[in-house]
Amino acid sequence: MAKQSAIEQDGSIIEALSNAMFRVELENGHIVIAHISGKMRMHYIKLLPGDKVKLEMSPYDLSKARITYRY
């Protein structure tokens, strides 16, 4: 069986949590917990509440996501 592809969504950061985790509100109104991708950590990209971001979500767990891009 092939691996399911990630779902890409846009959202905005509501709150910064501990351990580089963020509470993010998606464009459709849902709220998810997201962490920063490895490349963003390597390049020290800072995120603040109010920033618009692109997220990748697994089709198996839609309550968690990975932040892959900051607009």
Curated annotation (Swiss-Prot):
Assigned GO CC terms: cytosol
S1-like domain ranges (all copies): 1-71
PROSITE patterns recorded: S1_IF1_TYPE (PS50832)
GO molecular function: ribosome binding; rRNA binding; translation initiation factor activity
Family: Belongs to the IF-1 family.
Task performed by this protein: One of the essential components for the initiation of protein synthesis. Stabilizes the binding of IF-2 and IF-3 on the 30S subunit to which N-formylmethionyl-tRNA(fMet) subsequently binds. Helps modulate mRNA selection, yielding the 30S pre-initiation complex (PIC). Upon addition of the 50S ribosomal subunit IF-1, IF-2 and IF-3 are released leaving the mature 70S translation initiation complex.
Listed name of the protein: Translation initiation factor IF-1
Organism: Flavobacterium johnsoniae (strain ATCC 17061 / DSM 2064 / JCM 8514 / BCRC 14874 / CCUG 350202 / NBRC 14942 / NCIMB 11054 / UW101)
